[in-house]
Amino acid sequence: EAGTIIDGLQTTYSDYKVIKVEFYIHFSSTSTGYAGFQFKAGGSWITSPGYHSQCEYGRHHSQSNLTQDTNSNSSITINEDSNDRCENITGTLAWHRGPNSEDAMLTWDAKGMAYSGANYDFLLFNGAGGEAGTRNNTIEGIRWKNSSNSNLWWKVIGMK
């Protein structure tokens, strides 16, 4: 695990309206891997595949082409065969809190680069989400979730 991005959204950081993070992911081998994030609510990190509980960017060998797969747990995945290697993903994610208690959301924008034989393919990802059954204003934290063959660098670039 690459660590906790932020914990204490309802306590230590409750006065902040926007928290923005920049990240870069590199997959170091051709085996299946992933990198993404999870939410904390009710005092626990949500690890089950609940709707919008996690977002993943990954490299998999399950299909023969590059696709974006948005499924019931809000994972965003790059599927690839042995000739399509998604090696680099970069982007930002941000936590936004509005004036009302229910006006909170996480957004992300990312770009991926995949090499397929002699060509480079570029993919765009974006989305917004929260945790099913949990009001977004009660989300307490956000942390990274990644496999051992993914290298993940990140930095908080703004808090307001």
Question: How would you name each of these model-derived features?
Answer:
Residues 1-160:
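Surface-exposed molecular-recognition determinants
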